């Protein structure tokens, strides 16, 4: 369904008012709509001597970092005292949420299955649902060491954006969401400063001109009860596809995605090098400048220093999982966007 170009810009998933409090590595992306054995298999493809040297250098580097897993610092939010982090707000009454969802116009209900409903609304239509969106954002982001530290994760941008939501019919609760910004409308009323992405990256007029009309995406979350299921994220994307079918003028999608500070610097460096080598739009990246550029040491070896930078997503994910204390691989959203054909444009801190 999404046969259009999708432009994505990655950045930090945090409230704009907390830009100095949470220090995540952000990526700017755009769409067009290793286990040990994997390393060895790659090693066997070409010249024995060259591959042996590259393999040994590469593997030694990552083994050295594994020994220091226990020293990986906790995310900043987890180091905050409990007095700084406010308690999560009380949940909205489910009957009130159900009434708001049922009261939306039929054209705003995009996808329905036996268990779920995907729709969208603006903030004036769904007061209680917006409260629950802010509450669940904060819960989901805190769980990965991010979040605003406030009772609700809501910001000034929410008033001018649409809110895609996933509603669980079986449980009668909000299961997930995305924030969608219709860039042409936002720029017409508030200028480029009205875009959340512009607070993370300086977007040139040429960039805006090439993408517009476009949809800025971000602030995605899945309720913890549904995170182990594949359906919620897929259904949200079906909803995005249906929205584009209804509004075919939007040819491009762009927006920020974050790499949590819970990842070690080694893993982040490896992932960013992989993205720049294999999924980077060098031409369009000239029109985007990070507000706080990510700096990473050039001394980090990539295989074939290193002529053969890994170009397989699963291999990179396996390498990262070897480094990380909790064995996590490439972030879920980054994996999802890459499978949809995303290209990245810039990296921000």
Task: Tell me what each language-model feature is.
Residues 110-159, 163-167, 173-179:
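Short amphipathic alpha-helix that is part of the acyltransferase structural core
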Residues 11, 128, 138, 147-151, ...:
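Acyl-donor binding region in acyl/amide transferases
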Residues 82-124:
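Conserved N-terminal entry element of GNAT/NAT acetyltransferase domains
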Residues 65-69, 73, 142, 146, ...:
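Intrinsically disordered or highly flexible coil/loop and linker segments, enriched in small
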Residues 82-91, 169, 323-324, 334:
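Intrinsically disordered, low-complexity linear regions
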